[in-house]
Curated annotation (Swiss-Prot):
Alphabetized SUPFAM superfamilies for the sequence: ATPase domain of HSP90 chaperone/DNA topoisomerase II/histidine kinase (SSF55874), DNA mismatch repair protein MutL (SSF118116), Ribosomal protein S5 domain 2-like (SSF54211)
Pfam families documented for this protein: DNA_mis_repair, HATPase_c_3, MutL_C
GO CC aspect terms: mismatch repair complex
Top-rank taxon, per record: Bacteria
Keywords: DNA damage, DNA repair
PANTHER family: DNA MISMATCH REPAIR PROTEIN MLH, PMS, MUTL, DNA MISMATCH REPAIR PROTEIN MLH1
Gene: mutL
Family according to the record: Belongs to the DNA mismatch repair MutL/HexB family.
Name used for this protein in its record: DNA mismatch repair protein MutL
The keyword Electron transport is annotated on this UniProt entry: no
Length: 666
């Protein structure tokens, strides 16, 4: 083993500088933070050659006392803390006392500063960490510091610097973050003698956003806030139309400090997930004000990361604030259309016997897969029963003797499906013989559920709570104009034109219904009379094995059927009559693409795929009753405004919008 050497001060300072000072923008960041801590209200940053040749910071802060000028450049010399305990209640940008020592050790640094109580200031010049002179000088109150020839004495670091244009861009970015974090401070960035960025310190965050970005972004913002005992979360999030394909327009500030945090970003994006298209990222500026003792800012050399005491609570606070703000904004946009006062939602207690014709012993609901009628698209058959999912969930139709007692039915109706609910056994106390005998299947031309029977003796004492949604005054002033291209539904209401994407709207309805069933454990399945056998590759089979619980919880009954082969026996009822193999493989491929993501994200996308594949498609002709049913289903959703993939379900044109298009008004 080699001999252990004690490094000299110059070497240790250069090594320390390598951690704190990565590039010229790091110098700007550290020096501007010092100016902010000094209470400056006007800060000017001048750079040349991307900061490699010159960085000059001028502020009107409190300044440095003459006696402290030399000490300011010593390692770990700071006015911010006195002991280790102070780190955990720090409220300033800087606290380590490393910045000036690190910067001066790898550059030529000149500093002039004056406090208000002195008639003159002090000037110090340091080259490569060595003080060349210290003298009195005349200057304004505040501090001016010039850093030139950065890394001139560290050739190895110098040759790894990026181009001047790249460094200029990085400096512009960090200055923009300062403008957002401190709307009450005026910042002025001058690059090669020309003004590059200018803010006016109005104290208005929207003014800062407009300065940093543009008018379009500043006019498409949604305000959000959530205040708790120890934390306040507030800021702006952009409307979906200003989302981008990257996260460059996202800013997080914790106690005014610009940081990067994956879990905070995830909280905002998850709250925005259902409102954005795939692979789009929202614009946001989020501020988190929290008591210093609940965070640790001393976890990264550049202080660009923070650690929270309770990340779970933080995630929920951020998610709730953003999600409620977005929902509120969308609701306001469609207030006239989604007027909840027009919908009378009431609870009624009805016995099953009152809902279903009594007198028979059979319970049977087969579906003809060969039928071309869209009987299950909007529940025109099934939903004649109030909330039939709630009804069916209490009926276990999957008894072994269903098929055993009716061999003729099994052989003659290969394209029919049975409904089953695997999660609820409320009728187990009844005698199975009372409801498991099958007399005759429903005929293919049946248009309702009148042949769904229960023995009267078994149902007289049974009742369930049924929640119905009855239109009250909604259709009074609504006019269904029709379909455009059998894809878009046109509706007139209160002198406004609404255009609904029928696929996106129905997809959202199915998604919410299916998601609710999974969350409550009420997934109703259909028994396939002809099980679907699928051969998978080894990779596909492994993906299925890793995620088979997702399929099970979603209403699929899948069994291994030999090596790399599966047998699908049941699919979710809500899907109607899907192409089982295509649907299964689509979900499998999505799971493969998302294998590194959170379980909740995988489940969300799996449900979205199910809904997308089962929804009415573009170019499907809909009857007026089907359109009305779709609108009714949308009305009871918390968020009917976007499909699961983030596309809008509808757009609105006011009379004023149309008259502007036709130049009737200006």
């Amino acid at each position: 083993m080699r001999k252990i050497n004690l490094l000299d001060l110059e070497t240790t300072n250069k090594i320390a500088a390598g951690e704190v000072i990565e590039r010229p923008f790091s110098v700007v960041k550290e020096l501007v933070e010092n100016s902010i801590d000094a209470g400056a209200k006007n800060i000017t940053i001048e750079i040349e050659d991307g900061g490699q040749k010159l960085i000059k910071i001028i502020d009107d802060g409190e300044g440095i006392y003459p006696i402290d000028i030399k000490n300011a450049f010593l390692p770990h010399a700071t006015s911010k803390i006195n002991s280790i305990e102070d780190i955990y209640k720090i409220s300033t940008m800087g606290f380590r006392g490393e910045a000036l020592a690190s910067i001066s050790s790898v550059s030529k640094t000149k500093l002039k500063s004056r406090v208000d109580s002195y008639n003159f200031g002090k000037e110090i010049y340091i080259e490569g960490g060595k003080i060349e002179y210290l003298k009195d000088t005349g200057c304004n109150v505040g501090t001016t510091i010039e850093v030139s020839d950065l890394f001139y004495n560290v050739p190895a670091r110098l040759k790894f610097l990026k181009s001047a244009r790249s460094d200029s861009s990085a400096i512009s970015d960090i200055v923009n973050r300062f403008i957002l974090a401190h709307p009450d401070i005026s910042f002025n960035l001058i690059n090669k003698g020309k003004q590059s960025i200018k803010s006016y310190g109005t104290g208005n965050l929207k003014d800062s956003i407009r300065c940093v970005y543009n008018k379009t972004i500043s006019e498409n913002l949604i305000n959000f806030e959530n205040h708790k005992d120890i934390i306040s979360v507030y800021g702006f999030i952009g409307k979906p139309e200003i989302s981008r394909k990257s996260r460059t327009n996202q800013s997080i500030f914790v106690n005014k400090r610009y940081v990067k945090s994956k879990f905070i970003t995830a909280a905002v994006e998850n709250a925005f997930k259902s409102f954005l298209t795939v692979n789009s990222y929202p614009f946001f500026v989020i501020f988190i004000d929290i008591f210093p003792e609940y965070i640790d800012v001393n976890v990264h050399p550049t202080k660009s990361e923070v650690k929270f005491k309770d990340e779970r609570a933080m995630f929920k606070t951020i998610f709730d604030a953003v999600h409620e703000a977005i929902k509120g904004e969308l609701k306001e946009s469609f207030t006239n259309f989604f007027n909840k006062e027009d919908i009378n939602i009431y609870d009624s207690e009805k016995s099953i016997a009152e809902t279903i014709k009594p007198g028979k012993e059979e319970v049977q609901i087969p579906i003809d897969l060969n039928s071309n009628n869209k009987i299950d698209i909007f529940g025109n058959n099934i939903n004649k029963l109030p909330n039939n999912t709630e009804l069916l969930k209490n009926i276990d139709i999957k008894e072994k003797n269903i098929l055993e007692n009716n061999d003729n039915f099994y052989t003659s109706n290969q394209n029919e499906i049975y409904y089953t609910n695997k999660n609820d056994k409320c009728l187990n106390s009844c005698n199975k013989d009372d409801y498991s005998k099958i007399e005759k299947p429903l005929q293919k031309d049946n248009k309702n559920l009148d042949n769904l029977y229960l023995n009267e003796h078994n149902t007289n004492s049974s009742s369930i709570n049924i929640k119905e949604n009855k239109p009250n005054n909604f259709y009074v002033d609504m006019k269904i104009i029709g379909q455009f291209n059998n894809t878009y539904i046109l509706i007139e209401k209160d002198k406004e034109l609404y255009i609904i994407d029928q696929h996106a709207a129905h997809e959202k309805v199915l998604f919410e219904k299916f998601k609710s069933e999974i969350e409550k454990g009420y997934v109703v399945s259909q028994i396939l009379l002809s099980p679907v056998v699928i051969e998978l590759s080894e990779d596909e089979f492994n993906i299925y094995e890793e995620n088979k619980d997702i399929f099970k919880n979603s209403g699929f009954s899948v069994e291994a059927f030999g090596e790399c082969t599966i047998n699908i026996k049941e699919v979710p009822l809500i899907l109607g009559k899907p192409n089982v193999e295509n649907l299964f493989m689509d979900i499998l491929y999505n799971l493969k693409n998302m294998k590194s993501k959170e379980t909740s994200t995988i489940k969300y996308n799996a449900i979205a795929t199910l809904a997308c594949k089962s929804a009415v498609k573009a170019n499907d002709n809909l009857k007026e009753e089907e359109i009305k049913k779709l609108i009714e289903d949308m009305l009871i959703l918390n968020n009917p405004y976007t499909c699961p993939h983030g596309r809008p379900t509808m757009i609105k044109f006011t009379l004023k919008d149309l008259e502007k298009k036709f130049k009737r008004i200006q």
